[in-house]
Amino acid sequence: ITEELLKEMKDIPEGMFDESQERLNEFFKGMFDEETGADLTIITNAQMEAFKLIFTEVERLAAEYISKLFNHEVIASENTYEQKKYEFENFGHQFYCYLDIYFEDQDSIKIFEVKSTTSKKYDDFKITLEGEEFPLFLKNRDNIYEYVGDELIGTVAGKKVITQKMVEKKHDALFNKFSKVGKYIYDLAVEKYIVENSRINANDEFKDVEYYLVVLNSEYHFSGRYDENGKPIYDLDENGNALFKIYDLSDIVEEYFFKIDDECNRILENLKYLTINTHMLGECCEYKKTTQCKFCNICMKKVLRDGSILEFMKKNYAFSEETPDGKRDRLTVYELINRRYYTIDQCRDFLTKNDNIMQYECYVNNKVYIDKERIKLALKEIRYPIFHLDFESYNCPLPRFKGERPYEQSLFQYSLHVENRPGECDLVANHYEFLAKDHHDRRLELTEQLIHDIDLKNGGCVMVYNKSFEKTRLHELAAFFPKYKKELDNINEHVFDLLEVLNGSSALYDDILNTKLKE
């Protein structure tokens, strides 16, 4: 669809379109900005763009690792069109996929999908019972992880037993393409669907096909070794961990096959009739995620405005409605949007949570809620001088410096303003900063200067906004540089979180509700 085509569509005789086709026309027109003509479906993610070269390097390193692990040459390339390709045709539509890593031996075909994510979501995929943890993926003798859910049924933990229902609940998460563990399995299942249909059409079904997911090992710590060109050498770490973890998902994607087939048929049906459903928003939109649907700006045009229902805090738990038996059923924000509830002022009947009611009152009735007692308590906790601290970090998929893990937040800069007395903080004279001058490891220099700049000998506090980030970085620096642990721990102990003051309190919410009841 182009702007030129849309202009031509305006000249089509009136009445030629039925209602559904008019919705299509309106939908396509919405794909362009009315004033600038810009394509609203083009969404770029700056972080993903910056990581492109690193993602390519991850695939290259994964191919090297797999070739060595299986002792076999592999087909892999930085150029997508040089990768192994499978394709088939269905009702005039071409389906194809390029495979990240592929090789074929005498007995089987092995296909590897590489994702530049970490294994943490699969490491944490466990059943916890009586304080014991039972991983659902375990490493076999070939250093490959396999799903062992069914094997856990009947396992005793204390006085309890792992039941089939417990395992099934976890198993279902693997088939939710919007869950942390399911989204990558879904990608691999789509590949299997294309590969298997391609082989059927080519009458090439003589070998078994194995399907593997390859991700970065969240437990891997870089040794700090580099080659003669200064590139990191990702050999086994001191605990014997490799940079990658490999998951054999052959059985799981086999279960997925007919689900993918149903989805494919549904897509083909939609393409055939070009239907537009006006009540289609949901989890599938992946709004505000890196994988957000490119049509969000079009489909959600009526919602993306000032005072949007999407502005409610804790949206996952914000909405519910009363049932005939007097109970309340939870509603998602998308269910309300699909019912044409677009703004905060339309939603009062669905709110029961204190913080959401407060937000409604602030927006609709312009009320102001201030917890003066909480502010007084906070002010008593503040000690001068105040060191206003802000860190900047880079979470590279591939660890760059010794001791770092994949995606670890690597500090390269901090900004510090020192307020010696109330209101006494000169923008220049009381400002201190550190910025790494190159791409080498400058964490030690940053640590030493930070300790020098935050002088707590005479007391004071270190003010941050959302302390979890700064405190975690300080703990990491203390682990990297044990000789400065005492000083870094001291800074950590003096952290004051401004977010805890501004985020309200349960006592405040209770007071709001009591006030409303009196009114």
Segment roles from a protein language model:
Residues 59, 63-70, 111-113, 118, ...:
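Conserved RNase H-like, two-metal-ion catalytic cores of nucleic-acid enzymes
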Residues 1-111, 117-155, 315-368:
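Metal-dependent nuclease catalytic cores that hydrolyze phosphodiester bonds in DNA/RNA
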Residues 78-83, 100, 111-116, 172-175, ...:
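Conserved DEDDh/DEDDy metal-dependent 3′-5′ exonuclease domain
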Residues 5-25, 30, 35, 44, ...:
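Cys/His-rich finger/ribbon microdomains and the adjacent scaffold used
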Residues 123, 222-226, 397-402, 471-480:
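A short acidic (Asp/Glu
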Residues 120-166, 211-215, 220-258, 498-519:
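Active-site-proximal helix-loop-helix substrate-binding element of RNase H-like nuclease domains
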Residues 26-57, 155-188, 248, 252-260:
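Intrinsically disordered, low-complexity acidic Ser/Thr-rich regulatory segments
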